[in-house]
A protein has these predicted regions:
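Catalytic phosphate/metal-binding cores of nucleic-acid and nucleotide-processing enzymes, i.e., regions
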Residues: 1-101
Length: 101
């Protein structure tokens, strides 16, 4: 399953959509990790896509799960870079841990 996090853009074919941080958290709690997540950064008022990415990292750490594949489709260049940096750093950390085991 593919997950699309965005409050405005149309949902691409083959994706389930969540609009907000609370939707994102509820999706993971109910359905678990998708195979792929496409992130927007700016989600209107409230928490952002970066907050969703932080939740995802904690979710994976707590459950000892690998990070799913992801992309960031946000038009906000700073927000996009922040999400990519967080998730790519976590992905590298997971690789290092697996090599040590």
């Amino acid at each position: 399953m593919n997950l699309y996090l965005d409050d405005l853009r149309p949902t691409p074919e083959g994706f389930e959509r969540v609009y907000s941080y609370s939707d994102f958290v509820a999706y993971l709690k109910c359905k678990g990790l998708p195979d792929f997540i496409s992130f927007d950064h700016d989600l209107g008022e409230g928490l952002s896509g970066y907050d969703c990415a932080k939740y995802l990292v904690d979710y994976c750490l707590d459950r000892q799960l690998p990070l799913p594949d992801f992309a960031v489709h946000s038009q906000n260049p700073v927000g996009k870079e922040n999400i990519e940096r967080l998730l790519n750093n976590f992905k590298e950390q997971q690789k290092t841990i697996l090599k040590a085991i």
